Amino acid sequence: MYGYIYYFIFNLLVASFTFTLLRLYFLGDINQKNIYQFLTKIFLSKITFILFITLTSLNYLLDSYCEVIFISLNNSFVLINSFFNKLLTSNSLSINLIDVYAYPFIYVFLLITVLSIFFCMTYNTDELLTFMFYCLVILVSGYTLFFTDSLILFFFAYEMLLIPSFFILYKFAKTRRCVEAAYLMFFWTQFGALFLIFCFMYIFILCRDSSFSNISNYYFSSFEVNFIFICLLIGFGVKLPIWPFYGWLPKAHVEASTNFSIFLSGVLVKFAFFGLLKCLFTIQLEPTFIYIYPFLTIGIIDAVFKLFYQIDLKKLVAYSTVVEMHWLTICVVSGQSNLMLSSFCMMISHALLSTNSFLLVDAVARRFKTRLITEISGLNFMCPKLFLAVLLNTLIFLGFPGSIFFVSEFLFFTFFFDLFPLLSLFLLNFLYLLGPTFFFRSWMNIMFGYSNFLSNRLPNDLTSRETILFLGIPFLMYWLGISWQFLVI
C-alpha cells in the first residue's frame, strides 16, 4: 500500500515540475534572456526534492524485504534480521515500534508538501523556489529526526525545523501582524528548547552517553523519570501545542498565508508529537506523574470554549486543531499500547483534516473577500459544490462513521474509559457535545441562511481542480478508515 502512495506522490511531483515549466514558458514570468538560468534553478530544486524522496523510497523497500524472525529463548523473544544477518535484542524493539509511526507520517508529510507546492503555483517564481527550498530543508531535518540514534543530532534536527518555518512565515508576510506572529512563534519555540536542553544535558550527565540505544539500558529512578518527563512535555508541548503554551498558534495561523497554515498544522506540529513519542519510546520512560491529566483537561476546556465566540474562520479551525492535539497528547502520556494505536490514527486523521479545513477556508475567503463568519452566509445557494465540500469536511470533524477520524475517536474512548471512567465521561461531553456543537454552529451560519451577496454578482463555484482536491482528501480519510488495520501490520 505504501508503495502505491510513493508512486502517486512521485508522479505528482513530476507533474508539478512539468506544469511549472509550461507556466513559465507561456505566461512569460521571466525574461527570455534569463530563461535558462531560471529553468536551471527550478530543475535543480525539483530534482533535489525528487532525489531525496527516491532515497527514502529505497530505504523503505530495503526494510520491506528484511525478513524478521522471532525465536523463543528462555521465555524471552529475540529478533533476527535475515537481510543484514543481524541479531536484534529486545532493546531494539522500541526503535522498531518508532518505524510504525515514522513511515506513514513520511507519506502524509510528502502528500501535504505536494499540496502546499501546488498551492504556491499562483505565486511568482522566486517565492515558489524559496518555498521549495525551505520544504527541502524541513524534509532533510525531519528525516534525520526520525532515524537518528544520537541525542545531540536529534536535538539539532528538531531545532533546524524552526529556521525554515520562521523564514516561511517572515518572508511571505504581507502585514506587520504577520511579522509579529513570526517572532512570537520563534520566541515561544526557543522557550521550549531551553527545557529540552536541560533535559538532554541531565540525561547525558546521568548516562555518560548520547546514544538512544545505550540510554535505554540505563535505569532511572522515579524522580529522574518524572523530571525528564516534565521537561520533555514542556519542551515539545510548546510546539504541539498544549495549554498554556498555545497562544502563538492561532495568531500564526490567522496572519500566515494558506500554504504555511497547511504546513504548520499538517507537518510541523506533528514533528513535535513524533519527537515526544520517540523520546518516551527509546528511553523507555514509564512516567508516574499523573497530574499532567488535569492540565491537558484544562487545555481542552479552554480551547473548546474559545470555539464559541470566534468570528474568524481560520482562528476557528486553529482552535479545533488545538483541541485535537491535547487529545493526542493524552494518548501519548498514558503509555498504554491501545491508546498509542488511537494516537496513530489520530495523527494521520488530524493532518489530513486540518489540511482540508484550511484549504476550504482559503476557498471561502477568496470568493467572499473575507473570513468573518458574520459577513458570510448562504453558501448552499451561491456555491453548491463548495457547500458540499464544507458539509462533508464538517461531518468528518463531527466523527461521522467510516473515516479514520471516527476510528481514532472510537479507539480512544473505548480504552480510555477503562483507565479513567469519570474523566472519560467528562471529556466525552466536551469532545463530542460542546466542541463539535460550537464548531458546527459557526459553519452552519456560513452554509445556510439568506445572504446579502445574492443581490450582487454571485461568486464562482469550485473549479474542477478544487473539486478533485476537496473530495480527494475525504476519500483518502475514508479509505484509511476502512483499511486502518493494514496500517498497523
Predicted ranges, named:
Residues 1-133:
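Transmembrane helix-loop-helix hairpins at membrane boundaries of multipass inner-membrane proteins
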Residues 18-37, 114-125, 167-177, 240-253, ...:
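C-terminal ends of transmembrane helices
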Residues 86-104, 218-229, 418-424:
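Short aromatic-rich membrane-water interface segments that cap or initiate transmembrane helices
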Residues 133, 137-220, 307-371:
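Alpha-helical multi-pass transmembrane bundles of energy-transducing inner-membrane proteins
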Residues 181, 185, 221-293, 414:
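Short helix-boundary/re-entrant hairpin motifs in multi-pass inner-membrane proteins
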Residues 253, 329-335, 409-424:
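Interfacial segments of multi-pass membrane proteins
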Residues 354-357, 426-456:
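Predominantly late transmembrane helices and immediately cytosolic-facing juxtamembrane segments
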Residues 383, 440-489:
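Cytoplasmic/organellar membrane-interface segments at the starts of transmembrane helices
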